[in-house]
């Protein structure tokens, strides 16, 4: 039996990954992390979607320690969420949570070990993204190698969205006939607003711009998606 673990936040990207994983694996587990994020709503959305889409199990892990160490506008109410074009002096937006994906992928791999899953799937992307260093392909591959050495099991990190732009990610949801669900029922917004979100933060900007690009030229974007992924 082929099993996979999806790192699941209930947002557009991880939900699209879950939708695809359910088509590609016999058994799919979701793991969501409670790190004291600004909006608890994303945990509730993740729980609802994992059940609605048919995941085998949904594991919620308390990683509150990350909140103590990683100061970010996603973990502190007194730090405002910036507009999409705002950056800090180091080039990173205040929404960057240092070490988040290091911790999440490591814990997801441990969970995968326990449920005998062969893959950990994460929705990180290096094409249309906010510049987070722990979303880069080289980081994921390096951590994957370290994890395999550390647990002596060939657990594979899969990043199906890594080289897709946001329009192609929308096309992927549409390919599986779930575009409406992803648009209406996921929570990507940094201000915690479900669906189309606040329309002002970086996450909402990337999401809305990608959807608009897809809707303007569906055939071309879908063709590009299929060329990149090998879908038929």
From Swiss-Prot:
The free-text cofactor remark is: Binds 1 zinc ion per subunit.
Which residues participate in ATP binding? 8-18
Question: Which InterPro entries does this entry report, sorted A to Z?
Answer: QueC, Rossmann-like_a/b/a_fold
Q: What is its EC number?
A: 6.3.4.20
Q: What CDD domains is this protein classified in?
A: QueC-like
Catalytic reaction list: 7-carboxy-7-deazaguanine + NH4(+) + ATP = 7-cyano-7-deazaguanine + ADP + phosphate + H2O + H(+)
Q: In which pathway does it act?
A: Purine metabolism; 7-cyano-7-deazaguanine biosynthesis
**Which Pfam families does this chain map to?**
QueC
Q: Tell me, what is an example of a GO biological process annotation in this record? A: queuosine biosynthetic process
The record lists Zn(2+) as bound by: 189, 198, 201, 204
UniProt cofactor(s): Zn(2+)
Q: What family classification does the UniProt entry report for this protein?
A: Belongs to the QueC family.
What this chain does, per the entry, is described as: Catalyzes the ATP-dependent conversion of 7-carboxy-7-deazaguanine (CDG) to 7-cyano-7-deazaguanine (preQ(0)).
The name of this protein is 7-cyano-7-deazaguanine synthase
What organism does the UniProt record list as the source? Answer: Serratia proteamaculans (strain 568)
Gene that encodes it: queC
